[in-house]
């Protein structure tokens, strides 16, 4: 993608941050003028690599780029800046010459995210600059969600409970999917809502067809449904007539029907 488009992204962010315009969610108008962006400490640890050269060419102002995506994440998870948003004050973002893709570490008030220059180079080889920008944004949305999402209560933690893990990874990919961060062809029938990542994420994103604010309400359910469970949260958000099994079966039927058509 041409640099001019990236500069347009930068201009759009600066304009939106300085304007009085509101974000409309369903029938509720939400102002984000008071949202406090964290400090972004961007460090290049992959100097001299092809991946870094590609990243630096495509994203000339990473601070602005990262903050733009932060706003997209919090607007997907919350109604306004007055909500109970984790108070992330600093993000250490590094480009590193390592295998893998990306990962988030730490917690409030300071988190760290690394992104692999090797993955950038691989993406470039698979689809040019457009693929790099698409993949970089999608991966960033996922990792930023880990910083800003709420966590299930009363069921252990990420390493000890599969439901907790499935929620965390599923919501991160749901936010990514909701903001156009995956190819549409990635959504396929099969699996289980407990599989996490894209399998869970696409399912949760599909549930916005039941309620446009589903992802916000599902995120907030972690504070209201204790001990937390998928079925308990579904009933809390959509009503007692719904169940996780029933909605999953409906979702699978929808995917299968679309695949045949």
What label would you give each PLM region?
Residues 1-4:
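Positively charged n-region of N-terminal signal peptides that target proteins for export
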Residues 15-16:
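C-terminal motif of bacterial Sec signal peptides marking the signal peptidase cleavage site
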Residues 22-23, 56-114:
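Auxiliary, metal-adjacent structural segments of Zn-dependent hydrolase domains
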Residues 34-60, 118:
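Acidic/histidine-rich, surface-exposed loop or edge segments in extracytoplasmic proteins
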Residues 119-140, 155-164:
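Short pre-active-site segment immediately N-terminal to the catalytic Zn-binding motif
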Residues 138-151, 169-173:
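Active-site recognition of the HExxH zinc-binding catalytic motif
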Residues 159-200:
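Post-HExxH zinc-binding segment in Zn-dependent metallohydrolases
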Residues 200, 207-261:
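Pan-zinc metallopeptidase signature
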């Amino acid at each position: 993608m041409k640099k001019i488009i990236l500069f347009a992204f930068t201009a759009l962010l600066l304009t939106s941050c300085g304007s009085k315009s509101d974000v409309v969610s369903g029938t509720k108008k939400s102002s984000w003028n008071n949202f406090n962006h964290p400090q972004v400490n961007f460090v290049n640890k992959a100097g001299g690599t092809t991946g870094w050269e590609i990243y630096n060419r495509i994203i000339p102002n990473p601070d602005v780029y990262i903050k733009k995506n932060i706003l997209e994440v919090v607007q997907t998870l919350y109604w306004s800046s007055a909500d109970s948003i984790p108070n992330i004050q600093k993000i250490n973002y590094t480009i590193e010459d390592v295998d893998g893709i990306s990962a988030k570490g730490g917690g409030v008030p300071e988190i760290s995210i690394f992104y692999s220059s090797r993955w950038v180079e691989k993406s470039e080889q698979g689809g040019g600059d457009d693929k790099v920008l698409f993949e970089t944004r999608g991966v960033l949305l996922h990792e930023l969600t880990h910083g800003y999402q709420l966590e299930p209560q009363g069921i252990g933690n990420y390493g000890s409970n599969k439901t907790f893990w499935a929620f965390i990874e599923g919501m991160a990919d749901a936010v990514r999917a909701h903001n156009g961060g995956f190819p549409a062809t990635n959504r396929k029938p099969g699996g289980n809502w407990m599989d996490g990542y894209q399998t869970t994420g696409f399912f949760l994103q599909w549930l916005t067809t039941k309620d446009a604010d589903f992802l916000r309400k599902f995120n907030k359910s972690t504070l209201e449904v204790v001990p937390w469970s998928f079925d308990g949260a579904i009933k809390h958000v959509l009503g007692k007539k719904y169940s996780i099994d029933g909605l999953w079966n409906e979702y699978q039927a929808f995917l299968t029907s679309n695949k045949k058509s």
